[in-house]
């Protein structure tokens, strides 16, 4: 049975860097929310052991793609825990709509969707907690997509607390460049000393992103894009960029601004949602009978 699964984007509604550990990892406080917009991943299970990504992503080798790595990770894990049913493969297509290096979590979301989808198709029966624990080896943001609810994250991003931010409309804009998270986090000028605060205090304060001033300084196109969007709405960087987003009270007001955007701007309008579209989709598909 073939299904097309959503692979939603995320926003960092705020992002504060509170320190750096001896091992180089950054400690942070951030608020994640999903968007009702993202990539789409179509999966057809195979009865052999082959994983085939039939729509390669430009610039990413097949075996290094997080989609393929997630599928093989689940294969390997199920091999150890479900002898006799793990020898299944998949043909995978992706309709890639999210920009790479945009701060929208596209690669992590793809990995999480594959873990959840193949857990369903292969009937491996793992819990979301198990899948999230597997996913963290693929990327720090994978667990938030697996668990499927807006969350406040602490530590290096691994400590998650369910959150219920307001579900606003957003205009998300991309400047047409890719920004490496590693490049931003290793920059000596990155702000790393924001005081740790309780969530209640953070929710009452203006939402900010500690990476924003540095990224605006290093990338002229981000500076240009954010300056334009700030003329219309409260706006900021998501993650380490390159995407920025503006907050709107309605879809119509967001689309009105998008319709008058300069030609060089790439953007879309989406609503922030606290329940992941991936989990909403999963709850609506039929339960497979054991084979």
Swiss-Prot record:
Cross-referenced InterPro entries: GHMP_kinase_C_dom, GHMP_kinase_C_sf, GHMP_kinase_N_dom, IspE, Ribosomal_Su5_D2-typ_SF, Ribsml_uS5_D2-typ_fold_subgr
Functional note: Catalyzes the phosphorylation of the position 2 hydroxy group of 4-diphosphocytidyl-2C-methyl-D-erythritol.
Molecular-function GO terms, alphabetical: 4-(cytidine 5'-diphospho)-2-C-methyl-D-erythritol kinase activity; ATP binding
GO biological process: isopentenyl diphosphate biosynthetic process, methylerythritol 4-phosphate pathway; terpenoid biosynthetic process
Residues involved in ATP binding: 99-109
SUPFAM superfamilies: GHMP Kinase, C-terminal domain, Ribosomal protein S5 domain 2-like
Gene3D superfamilies given in the database record: 3.30.230.10, GHMP kinase, C-terminal domain (3.30.70.890)
Keywords for this protein: ATP-binding, Isoprene biosynthesis, Kinase, Nucleotide-binding, Transferase
Top EC class, one word: transferase
Protein name: 4-diphosphocytidyl-2-C-methyl-D-erythritol kinase
Organism, as annotated: Photorhabdus laumondii subsp. laumondii (strain DSM 15139 / CIP 105565 / TT01) (Photorhabdus luminescens subsp. laumondii)
NCBIfam families: ispE (TIGR00154)
Pfam families: GHMP_kinases_C, GHMP_kinases_N
């Amino acid at each position: 049975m073939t299904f097309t699964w959503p692979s939603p984007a995320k926003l960092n509604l705020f992002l504060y860097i509170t320190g750096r550990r001896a091992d180089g990892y950054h400690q942070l406080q951030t608020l994640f929310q999903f968007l009702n917009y993202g990539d789409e991943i179509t999966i057809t299970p195979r009865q052999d052991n082959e994983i085939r990504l039939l729509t390669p992503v430009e610039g990413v080798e097949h075996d290094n793609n997080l989609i393929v790595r997630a599928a093989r990770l689940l294969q390997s894990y199920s091999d150890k825990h479900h002898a006799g049913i793990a020898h299944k493969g998949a043909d995978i297509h992706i309709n890639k709509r999210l920009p790479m290096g945009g701060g929208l979590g596209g690669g992590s979301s793809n990995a999480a969707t594959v873990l959840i989808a193949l857990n369903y198709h292969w009937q491996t029966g793992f819990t979301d907690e198990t899948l999230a624990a597997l996913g963290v080896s693929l990327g720090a943001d994978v667990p938030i997509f697996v668990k499927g609810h807006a969350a406040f994250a602490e530590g290096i991003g691994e400590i998650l607390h369910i959150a219920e931010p307001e579900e606003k409309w957003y205009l998300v804009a991309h400047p047409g460049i890719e920004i490496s998270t590693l490049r931003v986090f290793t920059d000596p000028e990155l702000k790393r000393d924001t005081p740790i605060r309780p969530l209640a205090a953070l929710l009452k304060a203006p939402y900010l992103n500690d990476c924003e001033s540095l990224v605006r300084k290093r990338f002229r196109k981000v500076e240009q894009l954010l300056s334009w969007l700030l003329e219309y709405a409260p706006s900021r960087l998501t993650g380490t960029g390159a995407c920025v987003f503006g907050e709107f009270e309605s879809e119509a007001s967001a689309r009105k601004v998008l319709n008058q955007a300069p030609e060089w701007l790439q953007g879309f309008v989406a609503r922030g949602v606290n329940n992941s579209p991936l989990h909403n989709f999963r709850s609506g598909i039929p339960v497979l009978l054991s084979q």
